Amino acid sequence: VRIERHRIDEAALVAAEADFAERITGDVHRMQEDPRPAEGWRAVADSFLDYLGARSVRLPELHGKDAEAALGSAAAAAVGALELTLVPRRQFGVFIDYVGAGVSYGGEFDREEEPEAQDGEAGGGRQNSGRPVGQNDGWSEGRNHGRFEGRCGGQPVGQHRRRNDDTSGWLDALHLAFLASVADRATEVFIEAAPPWRGNEGRADVALVHALMAYVFGHEEGPDGFLPGRPDDYGLVRPDNLLVGRPDDIFGAGPVQDVEKCALIDMVVATLGEGDDWPGHRAALSTLRALAAGDEDGFHRRLARQLKQYRSRAEAGHAAPRSLLPLDALALMAMAHRWRGWDTKVESGYLPRALVTGFEPDAPRVRAYGGDKRADAVAALTEDPLVVERPTHPFAVQCLDPSPYDDCAAQEMTRFHDPREDPKALARELMSLMSDQRQRFLVRAALDPQGADPCRDEALVLGAEAGAGALRLARAEPGTEVDVTVGGTTRRLPAWRGTFRPNPHQWQQAVALALVLGEREVLADCVLIEPGFFAEGDHPSPGGAYCAALHDYLRGVDPEPAMDHALLIGGRADTGGFLAPPVVLLSQLVQGDRQGFVLALADALEEHREHYTVGARGKDMEAALNLDVLGLVCHARRLGWPVAVRSPYLPEGLLP
């Protein structure tokens, strides 16, 4: 079945994409002062959806990190808006990965509008478990959460006070959260914010809310707040085995099974009576019913009918670009694909593949330690070097003047050369000197990735020497003095312990510069740092684990335990807007797999490129080069390994 989408005015599509990164960044920052934040975050979510709808015209599958980040950010904004409707509210934050910014809330908005405290709510407050939203608090994680036990903060779930019953906001937030694979993190919010069934009988939108709560979260409101009757009252036929071994009540304690979910959906639908289906909630209920029953053919028939009805409604007015993405149908198809493994039998631009599959990535060319090499990738290596292109950096397009970076470097080095400068101040500023030279290096690389640029090379030398000097001081005993050489000048500087001591992230930057430079003494200052420097505590990070593995590899001890740990942490972590370190690439060096290194290198460079397609990230100087990757490549070349990858990310003038 093929269902074409309705058309959107070209001017609206262009406007939705034009300068989007700058516009949405401004909108998110203005949310810090928005007096009506729930409405503001809904508008932010709509802007992301307009952008995605417009992009889907050029990119029908909506693949890529930019679309993934935009969808996740739309979900974050929509869920945040929903949580802001709860009274009283817990402390929480809305963070927009696409922009790298957000707002924290502590329940300070509209407190004067709260009704008087009721029994069990001293001063209008609500007891909070203290757990982050989405953490296990009475229900299990995963697809079948089991029933939430009906209490949250001392009240029946679903009966907390709300300033409004914004059912459309609830539905949009749930659909977006599911598509972005974050619904389970906000389970408590959805259950608390759901409009109650009692008093809303006959409303198809509320019926859809409760049907989705049953199917997605395994939750039903409970005998006092859910359906005003029993299945028999609606002429429904219950399977004989539905009540085997349990009381004669489908609302008894325990998880809501699929057969019960079907019964619940039938019951809410039976209360609706006759009526039209604007804006399509009845059709969505019908599609959801087939999904719950496991009726694949019926599901796709109803989904096709749902989309045809949707198109007819959309064609009747001046629709916004976001109308190209019907969230209800998309979420239902995503549930069918991700939970039941059903392929999409309805061909339509309304159902971009990446949104349905959850942005399933392509299989990597190689996995850790040279495992599972893709046959096509290995075959490609036998023909020509792999090529990874790099977009022209905005600095080059704008012909950015790099002289301010050079002037800053000259001023810093003048101070370092001056014997009258305070040695303690110079010692404390070594890491700042490294950071400034690193930025200068990246700017120069962005402007001319392949050229022979003496200023770029000078920045590399000065940055690597400054980082190594800071680490040499960090190793020394407090109260002693150490010779540090930067730019041909040696100064005797005092060692100390305190807030200016380098951290593992700065070590990572310093060792990358040292590996690119290839000076043995400079690298030694990085490698000789004590292993305890990388202690992670109770919250290991991908970056810290990578540093520990790289440190073990470079200092010649068995690196596999630390490498295994880094791979484990990297696989578990949600890096959000941060680019993960090249752990798989490092594992090829640990394994000694030359072919695997080349394959992993191509993957790492493509991952870097894709990361910087999101929003305004491409304007960042870090987009020009991945110094972690470049450092490992230079190290491999010095080991004599052939690296059959050609890319502007690997400037020939820097490779050994």
Which residues make up each language-model segment?
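Eukaryote-skewed repeat-based solenoidal scaffolds used as protein-protein interaction platforms
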Residues: 29-126, 130, 134, 138, ...
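Terminal, non-catalytic domain-edge segments
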Residues: 1-53, 276-292, 300-447, 575-586, ...
